[in-house]
Amino acid sequence: MLILSVRYRLSILFLLTSFSLFAQNKTEVERSVSATAVPSAARAWLHETYASTPRLHWYLERSSGETSYEAKLRHRGAWHSVEFDEDGTLQDIEIIVGLSALPETARRGMAAYFDTTYTKHRIRKIQQQLTGPPEVVRAVVQGEPDEEVTYRYEVEFYGKNRRSKALWEGLFDDQGQLLERKRIVLRPTDNLMY
């Protein structure tokens, strides 16, 4: 009986820690900064990659204890968000896309996830995420296809099931399989009306 009890307790502990790692909270704070506050390596990479983009805005972002710099700009008709670490090294590029722009396999995989996990859901925003070596990502942004770039999809959605109703951010792979899910925590000042 004691052995069964210990196994039972270990199983419960494992399940609880697995769920807590899988569904963490996301609290993100952004504030506008001048270009001079951004590492020169980030500015140089951005200038080489998006040479013809006249306007861009820089932000300092704090999320989950990490600090990064983010440039937001419009390129070829789509909104791009380019994120760099504190040293100015490229982390990823996120491009706002519609559901129809996703590959069919990714759409089907996401639909299966939403249908089995939620009684109701509504997609708020989809961003195609590009990661890889900076020079390869640059080539893809400039229109050259490359196999070394990893494509993922960051999806903000409202989800409702028997247990909860919340705003979530899910990271899906190119097959539409959920890799990570975080509950988006809105600060009270995010919703102030003036």
Where are these regions (language model features)?
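Exposed beta-strand-loop-beta-strand "reactive/processing" segments of non-cytosolic proteins
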Residues: Y50-E83, R138-L171
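A short, surface-exposed beta-strand/turn
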Residues: H80-D92, S164-L186
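Acidic, serine/threonine-rich low-complexity disordered tracts
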Residues: V185-Y194
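Short helix/turn-capping signatures at newly exposed starts of structured segments
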Residues: Q24-T67, R74-A78, D85-G98
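Bacterial Sec-dependent N-terminal signal peptides
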Residues: M1-T27, L46
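Long, charged/polar, surface-exposed segments that mediate recognition or autoinhibition
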Residues: E86-Q129
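Surface-exposed interaction/gating patches
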Residues: T117-G132, V136-A139, V149-E154
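N-terminal short leaders/motifs
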Residues: L15-A37, A111-K120
